[in-house]
Amino acid sequence: MPLFPPCLPFARRLLPLSLAAALLAVPVMAPAAEETVRSFRIAAAPLGQALRQFAGQAGILLSAEGGLTQGKRSGGVHASLSIPQGLQQLLAGTGLVAVQLPDGSYIVRLAPVPLRADLDGEGAGLQVLAPVTVLGDNDDGYRRASSAAASRNDTALRDTPQAVSVVSAALIRDQDMRSLADAMRYMPGVGTAAGEGNRDTAVMRGNSSTSDFYLDGMRDDVQYYRDFYNIERVEAIKGPNAMVFGRGGGGGVINRATKQPQWTNDGEASVSLGAWRNRRAALDVQQVFGTEVAMRVNAMAENSDSFRQGVNVRRSAINPVLAWRLSPRTSVVASYEHFRDDRVTDRGLPSYRGRPFETDPSTFFGIAGSSPSWAYIDALGVTLEHDLGGGASVRNRMRLADYDKLYQNAFPGPVSADGENVTVLAYNSATQRRNLFNQTDVEWTVDSGSVRHRLTAGLELGRQTTDNLRNTGYFTTLGDNVTHISLPISHPVTDLPVTFRPSATDADNHGVADTAAIYLQDQLRFSSRWQAVAGVRYERFAVDFVNNRTDARIARTDTPWSPRVALIYQPVPALSLYASVSQSFLPRAGEQLASLTPSNAVFEPERFRNAELGAKWEVTPLLSASAAVYRLERSNVAVTDPIDTTRAMLVDGQRSEGLELDVNGKVQAGWSIAGGYAWQRAVLTATQAATAVEGATVAHVPRHSLSLWNRYDFSPAWGAGLGLIARSAVYASVSNTVVLPGFTRVDGAVYFKPHGHFQLQLNVENLFNKKYYASAHSNDNIAPGSPRALRMTALWRF
């Protein structure tokens, strides 16, 4: 079987051409200097915060390397000034200056007068560091150059020795992304599984997870479909890193960063209409109250059908966020979110003879009316930050979240050998969970001789209380104990009633998981060229698990150490080369805290170890590229002892290795790109079951995957987008008996902005109406890709 479908050779040729064009292009036009006088109201604050507020009030793209602003404060600006004058006053006394770039954006740099000798003794003077975008309403392409989650502090990606892919707010907006599946297609090395039609499932470097999701760096691990209505960016932080995130994250984690108050009085409202009665409205409003309080409210409502027969989604949400400056050194941000998602659980299509069953993609298999799913979430978050002075600061974050989740489904099983009938089964599963987490971080930047240390020490405490209940579906009109039926493949739906009740083996349990962890990280800068990162986390993770059906109680406590070590070499300021080693662990309770049994409770957690080499290049202040090669080993996998089948044993169970290439940003004025390529190989290194044998390829992992999106603005009023997503074949399960063929999908968009406050946007998914299979959960739960779908969005800014 070819690795790429017939149309993919074109994609293979297109990627290097696009990358070459991006890396060689330079801005060619410089706008006139900004001389318009504006009224600025910015109170004294930490410099990074003041710069963000200035950029929002000025409506400019403003960039600054995170290390330059660390520990510095601004006296603020309260005057009517031009943008250059305002920046000059804002930066007074900091030793920094703002410089306008040819594309009209601004970058904060060291002042031309040397402030201190070069750390490596090679001289003193101006060193231009790669910028980190802190805020800007102007389109900066799709580049984001920093992450607050990957290192537990705001660190430039260039100084982060780990592969990180970021989907920015601009890319989310331009593609009208609404789900993590949409975003993950533009993250090299990150894929999706179907998630049984009721949840996000990420596949990162060969490891599938339903729990490795974070919101503003805090755990958000219940199974549901997340929305982007209040999201500023999405980050894939690849490779295990328990030093930062704690348990899990064997292949990495997905972090969503929410929209925060930007100390401006503005807002936007949007309405979308599209194929299959797609209807959605969203609102984003900001308001400043004096100089000390600001609020931002995001809200959303959606009522949409699907190309799949009988499938729909109804969702709504609201997220108010309040920021309060208690003093020039202290701030508090409080947020609340209410989120509701009601939909029909769609398990997709079955397979036949090693391929997805050939039928119309709209065909539903099972009973749509007996397949409701809902997720109701209420979450409260509070962040307190205080500048201690002397390069030190403290931050405390708390998140309390209640989750109420149920999914019920009557879904397809195997197709009969003659291809005439399909089996249908049913069950439901309910989860109620309360998460309470508190993180306290103390950060201190200090020089020790010729070495600069950026120290982060912290404490994390958490409790998760979970109740799980599962019931089997019985087709009682055919018999009290009938749990499956056979339907003709020509009409694989029925309205037979289903009765749900517990079987002898269905889950009914209660669990409490307690986390207590301390960690220490040192980001060392030895010179302008050499850096290192070293950190370690000690965690006590205890689970108390009760089987309500048997009254059996099981407990397990793990106390692992999780180190992280990396070295960074920067031969020139814009280029970083790094080597890193990190690891993580997964307790026997499993990612959803419901897998602890008497037989596995005696075993140590699974281990994930990642070794990585990479390069990150800031091609221009608005365009970046990266590359990474890695090997990830999964060990302590529990399998049946082949000699004594009554016992279990631990083996080194899986190896993943690969190459990831990533490019994001603005090539030149008007042209933005986002894309990447990944080569992956993930295999089992030991037999784990009769259908999971040594040498098998891990499910949902393509050998090749490619994504590339371009937006070009022809004028201030008109723009267009064009992109492709391509993937080689994948297996639906680790049995390697069912193959989802590779595919290439082309998407497009047109943007019309008649004036500064109003925009129309048309997005076309699957422009050429390609038939393909997007993902799978198992051999007989395969999700077909959508046919051509159009969505029109009207947006009004005020």
Predicted regions and their residues:
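Acidic, small-polar-rich N-terminal luminal/periplasmic segments of exported/outer-membrane proteins
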Residues: 61, 128-264, 613
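Membrane-embedded beta-barrel scaffold of Gram-negative outer-membrane proteins
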Residues: 384-399, 403-411, 577-578, 605-686, ...
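C-terminal beta-signal and adjacent terminal beta-strands/loops
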Residues: 726-733, 751-798
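Outer-membrane beta-barrel translocator/receptor signature
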Residues: 229-232, 243-320, 326-330, 378
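Structural signature of Gram-negative outer-membrane beta-barrels, strongest in the C-terminal barrel
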Residues: 323-327, 433, 452-456, 460-464, ...
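Gram-negative outer-membrane beta-barrel transporters
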Residues: 631-633, 650-735, 768, 793, ...
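Acidic/polar loop-and-plug regions of large Gram-negative outer-membrane beta-barrel proteins
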Residues: 302-306, 318-387, 400-433, 479-507, ...
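Face-selective signature of the C-terminal outer-membrane beta-barrel domain
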Residues: 380-403, 426-546, 666
